[in-house]
């Protein structure tokens, strides 16, 4: 007799979901921490507007990764929510907000890059740092305001049933909840995905055209890498996820495959470091220098550990030799006190 939990609300493999979350966490966290160190160092030396935007994007990715273990616990528990309920809407709010923050900041970075190349003289005479700060605040507010729908849905109607009949978190919805959620999702897909995608596509297409006419090969390669990483984010990580919003609005319910395209959207935290890497030659130089320092510290630690092991092994060998030396010394002292015959016989 099957006594396992009812998973009619989720027909997929929850261990696959857990594996994707775990992979994202293990790969994305160290990469974004390295990027955070580089951006903080750059802003302390010579602050640039694009670095302000990318620093906010890094902070957004780290926020997603820090809350990802909650999703991992949920997946390991068969897509049930075993944690205190107050953490359910909070984790959902952080999760979806950071996803859309990436799209907004990528669009802002594309505008910044386009202006610096298409209008270099005008760009240099403008106070970009203050504007970059205001744009960052606007992006955080815009994404947060839209994704606050998580709280509206979770606490609308009968709160006692807000976790669904299976104790789930933001997986099951009543008809009155879907009447609110599906139109909001469609609006989010248009405002927070389609519009940033159009802006980013225009800016980078113009940027490639300008550099193709007279830019250096090194700069062309860097822009090509930046464009590839950005399009990978939009088309692979975010595209299918936002398509599920459109399909859900048309069908009147969330599609069954939505959970899997949501997994794709979490992978953006692993792709964003490549956006940082191709964003500027200065980031590449600082990143390589940081890696050299870390490798040097690792080599120094290994050398010190090896020396400690050798000293420890040498000390053990000396302690093992002391009883034999003591026995030999006592034997020779006995021979010197009149036991020559016995010593000779031995």
Swiss-Prot record:
InterPro entries: GPCR_Rhodpsn (IPR000276), GPCR_Rhodpsn_7TM (IPR017452), GPR40-rel_orph (IPR013312). Residues 307-330 have a biased composition (Basic and acidic residues). Keywords: Cell membrane, Disulfide bond, G-protein coupled receptor, Glycoprotein, Immunity, Inflammatory response, Lipid-binding, Membrane, Receptor, Transducer, Transmembrane, Transmembrane helix. Changing residue 185 to A: Loss of SCFA-induced G protein-coupled receptor activity. GO terms for biological process: adenylate cyclase-inhibiting G protein-coupled receptor signaling pathway; cellular response to fatty acid; G protein-coupled receptor signaling pathway; inflammatory response; mucosal immune response; negative regulation of blood pressure; positive regulation of acute inflammatory response to non-antigenic stimulus; positive regulation of chemokine production. It is a multi-pass membrane protein. It is found in: Cell membrane. Residues 1-19, 69-88, 154-178, 244-258 are extracellular. Highest level in adipose tissue, and lower expression across all tissues tested. Expressed in sympathetic ganglia. This is Free fatty acid receptor 3. The gene is FFAR3.
């Amino acid at each position: 007799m099957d006594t396992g939990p009812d998973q009619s609300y989720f027909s997929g493999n929850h261990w696959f979901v857990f594996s994707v979350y775990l992979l994202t966490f293990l790969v994305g966290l160290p990469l974004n921490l390295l990027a955070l160190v580089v951006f903080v160092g750059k802003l302390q030396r010579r602050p640039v507007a694009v670095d302000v935007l990318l620093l906010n994007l890094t902070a957004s990715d780290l926020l997603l990764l820090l809350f990802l273990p909650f999703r991992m616990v949920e997946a390991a528990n068969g897509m049930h929510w075993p944690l205190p309920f107050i953490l359910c809407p909070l984790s959902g709010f952080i999760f979806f907000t950071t996803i859309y923050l990436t799209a907004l900041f990528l669009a802002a970075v594309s505008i910044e890059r386009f202006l610096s190349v298409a209008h270099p003289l005008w760009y240099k005479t403008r106070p970009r740092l203050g504007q970059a700060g205001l744009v960052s605040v606007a992006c955080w507010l815009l994404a947060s305001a839209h994704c606050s729908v998580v709280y509206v849905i979770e606490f609308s109607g009968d709160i006692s049933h807000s976790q669904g009949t299976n104790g789930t978190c933001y997986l099951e919805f009543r008809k009155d909840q879907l009447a609110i959620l599906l139109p909001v999702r469609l609006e989010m897909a248009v405002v927070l995905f389609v519009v940033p995608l159009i802006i980013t596509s225009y800016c980078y297409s113009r940027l490639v055209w300008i550099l193709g006419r007279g830019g250096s090969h090194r700069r062309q390669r860097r822009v090509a890498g930046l464009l590839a990483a950005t399009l990978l984010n939009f088309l692979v990580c975010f595209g299918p996820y936002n398509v599920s919003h459109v399909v859900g609005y048309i069908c009147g319910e969330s599609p069954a495959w939505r959970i899997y395209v949501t997994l794709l959207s979490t992978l953006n935290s692993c792709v964003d470091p490549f956006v940082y890497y191709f964003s500027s030659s200065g980031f590449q130089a600082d990143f390589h220098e940081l890696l050299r320092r870390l490798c040097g510290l690792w080599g120094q630690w290994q050398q010190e550990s090896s020396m400690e092991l050798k000293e420890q092994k040498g000390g053990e060998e000396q302690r093992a030799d002391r009883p034999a030396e003591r026995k030999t010394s006592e034997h020779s002292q006995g021979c010197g006190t009149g036991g020559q015959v016995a010593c000779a016989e031995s």
